[in-house]
């Protein structure tokens, strides 16, 4: 596989629990942020994410925890499309500490494309399908200041 899209985010104090590790529910937040940045980088126009052109809802999310992340770690989240159907698609996520190889968390998340008013399923247009297939390969969004 070519280099997937990467999103870098720093773990903040309020995202950690009494065990001094990232609270388990926060991984869903990181995945949601990475999905948004992936779509912003991959879709034909960044506005497609904001203007209702490509409205999505999460319908299934499986998260597998392998090791803890801690306060001030920089998480490197790799994102790619695994399957693209008629109205839904699956994104895969791998979370690691930036610069390290060991997996902390993996996720497969299924999204359905919906009409922004009725929330009924909507077919994924060919140009959006092509954008998901290409997937912003090789691009990185750094909200941690890690690469600066």
What kind of feature is each model-predicted range?
Residues 1-76, 82-148:
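Terminal targeting signals and extreme-terminal segments of soluble enzymes
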């Amino acid at each position: 596989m070519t280099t997937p899209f990467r999103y870098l985010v720093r773990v903040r104090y309020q995202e950690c629990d009494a065990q001094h590790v990232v609270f388990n529910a926060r991984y869903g937040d990181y995945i949601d942020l990475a999905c948004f940045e992936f779509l912003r980088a991959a879709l034909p126009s960044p506005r497609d994410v904001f203007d209702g052109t490509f409205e999505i809802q999460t319908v299934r999310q499986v998260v597998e925890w392998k090791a803890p992340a801690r306060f001030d770690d920089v998480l490197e989240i790799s994102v790619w499309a695994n399957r693209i159907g008629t109205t839904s698609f699956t994104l895969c996520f791998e979370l690691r500490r930036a610069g390290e190889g060991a997996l902390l968390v993996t996720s497969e998340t299924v999204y359905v494309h919906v009409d922004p008013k009725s929330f009924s399923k909507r077919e994924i247009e060919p140009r959006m399908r092509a954008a998901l297939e290409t997937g912003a390969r090789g691009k990185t969004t750094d909200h941690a200041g890690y690469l600066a």
